[in-house]
């Protein structure tokens, strides 16, 4: 491979919550037992150095010693348009349809604020990304879950009958959709998205689609943007993206929305701008331009190969050494969602004991119950 995905780099003291946040009173219960180092496998943050074009773009901009007010560059918009066309087959995207968001979750709330009233019911699938749960609850929205169900092959699927039932019974007119799905790792097939959009159109449900993981698709799978499903989907959907998951840029801050519906776009732009908080950082702008290049695309292709190999190894190891721990190999993202129900029953253990055993030897992982997995670890 051309890029380095094997070096172990010490991130301690370098602004990495993945390791520095694991202290008593922080994000970890206590340090591991003597002789064990921390292996950060909790927050969605990779331990790979980012693509060189990003650091080069930032370094070049820093050489100019002025960081005053600025306008978003055409290079920024053109980089997004080209990236979406190259990676996702998107056509007809113009700069007018792109809007800056400090973060995907902030974009979710801005969109909900113009689509709903406080206290409205909003449809989400469960298991559920913990960020959705916190943001929607904190902002006064009521979450109605439609559980994903496993098919005969153990693959998580949408339960369309349950979705329709929940939509009708709860008078729902907005959904927050995750594609690819976190934490289950599903990369939805076209027929699944088409069927979901048919339901949303039938019952006048607006769609807020978090596609932040759309670049991290494991080999053998393909991401399909929700807005590409139909003209109605294009007009009904607020799509949210960011280079942060793909290139390890969460600390730089910077996401964006794509909204083709002008009336909806104008309202979301207005909502996002009300506090003047939702403002771009100049270095973040240059980082995106550095990321969304041909070299960035080549780097992502090698990243996908690396993650695919790591996932294959991890799932094979778990199946061989921990019978009873069920894990569906993710099709996208780099998260594993471990169902420990059978293993715990067979060994007389609780999920708390299993999690603690991991922390004792330095495996920093997350309680799956926060993601609506009753006996799970993410």
Walk through the language-model features, giving the residues of each.
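Conserved glycine-rich beta-strand-loop-beta hairpin in the small C-terminal domain of fold type I
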Residues: 289, 305-315, 327-341, 375
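Conserved core segment of the aminotransferase class I/II
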Residues: 56, 230-308, 315-316, 320
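Hydrophobic residues in well-ordered beta-strands that form the structural core
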Residues: 124, 145, 209, 365-367
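Conserved core of the PLP fold type I
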Residues: 67-198, 215-216, 221-229
């Amino acid at each position: 491979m051309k890029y380095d995905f094997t070096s172990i780099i010490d991130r301690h003291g370098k602004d990495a919550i993945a390791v520095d946040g694991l202290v008593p009173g922080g994000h970890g219960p206590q340090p591991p037992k003597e002789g064990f180092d921390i292996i950060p496998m909790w927050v969605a943050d990779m331990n790979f150095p980012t693509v060189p074009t990003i650091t080069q773009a930032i370094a070049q901009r820093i050489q100019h010693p002025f960081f005053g007010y600025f306008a978003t560059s055409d290079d920024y918009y053109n980089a997004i348009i080209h990236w979406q066309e190259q990676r996702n087959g998107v056509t007809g995207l113009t700069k007018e349809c792109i809007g800056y968001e400090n973060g995907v979750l902030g974009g979710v709330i801005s969109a909900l604020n113009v689509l709903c009233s406080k206290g409205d019911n909003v449809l989400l699938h469960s298991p559920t990304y913990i960020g959705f749960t916190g943001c929607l609850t904190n902002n006064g929205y009521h979450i109605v879950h439609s559980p994903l169900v496993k098919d005969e092959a153990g693959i998580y699927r949408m339960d369309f009958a349950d979705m329709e039932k929940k939509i009708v019974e709860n008078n729902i007119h907005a959904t927050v959709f995750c594609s690819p799905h976190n934490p289950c790792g599903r990369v939805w097939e076209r027929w699944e998205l088409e069927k979901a959009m048919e339901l949303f159109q039938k019952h006048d449900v607006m769609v807020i689609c978090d596609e932040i993981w759309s670049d991290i698709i494991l080999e053998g799978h393909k991401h399909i943007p929700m807005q590409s499903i139909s003209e109605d989907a294009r007009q009904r959907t607020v799509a949210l993206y960011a280079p942060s998951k793909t290139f390890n840029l969460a600390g730089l801050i910077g996401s964006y929305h794509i909204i083709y519906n002008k009336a909806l776009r104008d309202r979301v732009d207005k909502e996002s701008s009300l506090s003047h908080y939702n403002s771009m950082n100049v270095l973040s702008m240059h980082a995106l331009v550095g990321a969304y290049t041909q070299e960035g695309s080549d780097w992502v292709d090698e990243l996908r190969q690396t993650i695919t190999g790591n996932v294959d190894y991890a799932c094979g190891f778990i199946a061989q050494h921990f019978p009873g721990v069920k894990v569906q190999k993710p099709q996208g993202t780099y998260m594993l969602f471990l169902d420990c129900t059978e293993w715990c029953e067979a060994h007389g253990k609780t999920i708390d004991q299993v999690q603690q055993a991991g922390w004792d030897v330095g495996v920093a992982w997350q309680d799956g119950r926060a993601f609506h997995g009753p006996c799970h670890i993410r």
